[in-house]
Amino acid sequence: MDTKTQSLPITHTQPHSNSRPQGHTCSQCTCSSHCQTCSQSCSQSRSSSQSPTGHHSSSGHQSQSPHPTLPPRHQKHTRHSHHCPPRPTTHSCSYPKNRKNFEGKVNKRKVVKRSQQVYKTKRRNSGRK
């Protein structure tokens, strides 16, 4: 039992010291690769927009292959921007709902008054009998 507890911290310290530098290099690698991919896609979109200047429609169609990579990215952005509008839409939705509820309440009150009147007349009729 004692040897196990002693060996555990030792094995724990080793991966920790190993994972720390690895994690740093990993994060740096991902960052640089991400930046490279970003810059590459940016340069590609720039070059593609420059090369098909409307002179060759056929080459424009071919150069559209890098373009489809851009629209999905735009779609993601659009989705994010779409996520924001629904909130105001819900507000505008709740506004008419409140209106309807208000009208409904007024109508219900009228209906209740009518039913009460009918109830009174019925009572009177039953009282007459």
UniProtKB/Swiss-Prot annotation:
One of its GO terms (cellular component) is nucleosome. Zn(2+) binds at H12, H16, H24, C29, C31, C35, C38. Signal peptide: none annotated. A motif (Nuclear localization signal) lies at residues 104-112. The keyword Disulfide bond does not apply. Pfam families: TP2. Residues 22-67 have a biased composition (Low complexity). Testis. Keywords: Chromosome, Developmental protein, Differentiation, DNA-binding, Metal-binding, Nucleosome core, Nucleus, Phosphoprotein, Spermatogenesis, Zinc. One of its GO terms (biological process) is penetration of zona pellucida. Residues 1-129 are annotated as: Disordered. The modification Phosphoserine is found at S126. Residues 1-21 have a biased composition (Polar residues). One of its GO terms (molecular function) is zinc ion binding. It is found in: Nucleus; Nucleus, Nucleolus; Chromosome. Belongs to the nuclear transition protein 2 family. Plays a key role in the replacement of histones to protamine in the elongating spermatids of mammals. In condensing spermatids, loaded onto the nucleosomes, where it promotes the recruitment and processing of protamines, which are responsible for histone eviction. This is Nuclear transition protein 2. It comes from Canis lupus familiaris.
